[in-house]
């Protein structure tokens, strides 16, 4: 029961954070949205989005893994944040940065699916 409550709280926090990011986007406050994404990344994995883009996929997955088990909630959070980041870059007219964010997000989602099947 406690674990279910915790999962629901985490899901609500993620939804609230994504709503704040979307709100910044709607106001065209892209820097505010990107700053919020960086803040949540630091809370989740201890580093900002720039570092996530600079490291290898294997290193990122290692950061999202504890005792050999992928933290699915944290991985899903990172995938959602990177997708939102890609949306912002796309709105700013930066397709290369958007593509990179989308690609990392997609790879994280695929990793969740592949590990779930295994």
Locate the predicted segments by residue.
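Residue at a conserved register position within TPR or TPR-like alpha-solenoid repeats
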Residues: 24, 82-85, 89, 109
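Elongated alpha-helical scaffolds
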Residues: 74-84
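N-terminal alpha-helical interaction modules that lie
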Residues: 1-76, 110-111
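Short acidic, glycine/proline-enriched loop segments that cap or flank alpha-helices
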Residues: 69-74, 89-98, 117
